């Protein structure tokens, strides 16, 4: 099946986000607060294309065909699982996706890079505005039939790393309280 997808150069869907247990635990351990998730947008530009090109195939987001919505959904899942999500919370997390790319062209290694600006507001006042980024590498192959499915499979791990860097920032967690 993967070989057929690769050879036809068609469009594939990124896997739905699966929350990181470590990220959820970090949110649980970060104190008493609740937050809601606002809109995430995407700033078009080099290194932030939609869909993502993978050796002639293209990968789309399962969330309204938007990778900004992918990051938004990821934060919603992790806040919900940590019992920190509340639709009427004062603190609102929103953001802008600045960079989002996978490279499956390497002979033995695939890479991914993602960068986003995260904003926390309370009653219209910005309490946090920072750019976070993540880089992820995985074993790959020269053979497209191996490299492309592997890159697709690794995308959620890239987003998990981005959110881990956000949750590791004490200023972000403090802004939520």
Residues covered by each model-derived region:
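Short alpha-helical linear motifs
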Residues: 42-44, 114-119, 154-159
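Short secondary-structure boundary motifs at beta->alpha junctions and helix caps
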Residues: 51-64, 125-168
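Sec-exported extracytoplasmic/periplasmic mature domains
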Residues: 76, 80-84, 102, 163-171
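A structural "domain/chain start" motif
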Residues: 10-69, 73, 171-177
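Surface-exposed short loop/turn segments
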Residues: 11-22, 81-129, 133-149
């Amino acid at each position: 099946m993967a070989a057929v997808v690769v050879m036809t150069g068609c469009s594939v869907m990124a896997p739905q986000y699966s929350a990181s247990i470590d990220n959820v635990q970090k949110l649980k351990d970060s104190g008493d607060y609740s937050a809601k998730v606002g809109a995430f947008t995407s700033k078009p530009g080099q290194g932030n294309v939609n869909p993502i090109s993978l050796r002639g195939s293209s990968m789309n987001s399962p969330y309204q065909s938007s990778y900004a919505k992918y990051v938004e959904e990821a934060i919603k899942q992790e806040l919900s699982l940590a019992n920190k999500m509340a639709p009427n919370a004062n603190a609102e997390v929103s953001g802008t996706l600045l960079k989002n790319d996978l490279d499956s062209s390497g002979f033995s290694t695939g890479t991914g890079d993602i960068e986003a600006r995260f904003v926390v507001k309370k009653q219209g006042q910005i309490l946090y505005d920072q750019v976070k980024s993540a880089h992820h590498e995985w074993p790959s192959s020269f053979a497209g039939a191996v490299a492309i499915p592997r890159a697709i499979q690794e995308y959620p791990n890239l987003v998990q790393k981005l959110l881990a860097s956000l949750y590791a920032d004490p200023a972000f967690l403090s802004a939520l309280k």
